[in-house]
From Swiss-Prot:
GN (gene name): rnhB
Cofactor(s) this protein cannot do without: Mn(2+); Mg(2+)
Domain of life: Bacteria
Annotated RNase H type-2 domain residues: 70-258
Listed EC numbers: 3.1.26.4
Organism encoding this protein: Streptococcus pneumoniae serotype 2 (strain D39 / NCTC 7466)
Gene Ontology biological process: DNA replication, removal of RNA primer; mismatch repair
Source organism phylogeny: Bacteria, Bacillati, Bacillota, Bacilli, Lactobacillales
Protein name (database record): Ribonuclease HII
Protein task: Endonuclease that specifically degrades the RNA of RNA-DNA hybrids.
Annotated compartments: Cytoplasm
Keywords for the protein's UniProt record, in alphabetical order: Cytoplasm, Endonuclease, Hydrolase, Manganese, Metal-binding, Nuclease
Length: 259
């Protein structure tokens, strides 16, 4: 009779719920064996569910594949709302029918998985572009226009250039066909890939800024207006990376000028 360890090793090779190996092993009454069978079945079901989820997130891409297009770029940004730091956009072209396990809207990915999935996108993407627009430009042109500039910069870095743009809820003034998708980072794998690239890139930048400007907790809050960030603003004032067109930074700058 096989040991439970041997059965566990055998079950790792089973990829289908209908496998005859399950039928054979279910005759074994040992609780340890039944536990391993249940565990493996749950793992297979989870893989099937994940594959279906990824498949559903390729619906926009598949429509474009039918039209003969393959160089499809997903575009997304991170950093519209913070009081400090740049807005970062990423543009990612994935291979046809590419499925990266765990890839999703970056806001839905556990933080501990960010770097792993970011690396998987880096490894599998045909091309990646990153656009970074700093706080000074944001203050000059407004955050909406700065976001478009970041996206255009990211697209300009791609090689080869894309045949179609999938963009999260925006339209760009570019001579390339495009589709604007509401909640695109949750509905398109290409946009989700751009979402995680932009997120990790910006988070790493804000960690560097945390070293340059301690006291604002940038490494944790990424420039968003948390209690610690606002406390830092009150105690230490405005840094060169703060957006002076955003409140309460704007009022702090005006108050300093008036005094």
């Amino acid at each position: 009779m096989a040991t439970i360890k041997e059965i566990k090793e055998l079950l790792v090779t089973v990829k289908e719920l209908e496998s005859p190996i399950f039928l054979e092993l279910e005759k074994d009454n040992r609780s340890g064996v039944q536990k391993e069978i249940s565990k493996r079945k749950r793992a297979i079901q989870a893989e099937l569910d994940e594959n279906l989820r990824l498949e559903s997130m390729l619906s926009y891409e598949k429509e474009l594949y039918k039209q003969g297009l393959t160089l499809i770029v997903g575009i997304d940004e991170v950093g519209r709302g913070p009081l400090a730091g740049p807005v970062v956009a990423a543009a990612v072209i994935l291979p046809k029918n590419c499925k990266i396990k765990g890839l999703n809207d970056s806001k839905k990915i556990p933080k501990k998985k960010h770097l792993e999935i970011f690396q998987a996108v880096q490894d599998q993407a045909l091309s990646i572009g990153i656009g970074i627009i700093d706080n000074q430009v944001i203050d000059q042109v407004n955050i909406y226009e700065a976001t478009k500039l970041a996206m255009q910069e990211a697209i300009s870095q791609l090689s080869p250039q894309p045949e179609h743009l999938l963009i999260d809820a925006m339209k760009l003034d570019l001579p390339i066909s495009q589709t604007s998708i509401i909640k695109g980072d949750a509905n398109s794998l290409s946009i989700a890939a751009a979402s995680i690239v932009a997120k990790v890139t910006r988070d790493e930048l804000m960690k560097e800024y945390d070293q340059q400007f301690p006291g604002y907790d940038f490494a944790t809050n990424a420039g968003y207006g948390t209690a610690k960030h606002l406390e830092g603003l009150t105690k230490l004032g405005v840094t060169p990376i703060h957006r002076t067109s955003f409140e309460p930074v704007k009022s702090l700058v005006l108050g300093k000028k008036e005094s």
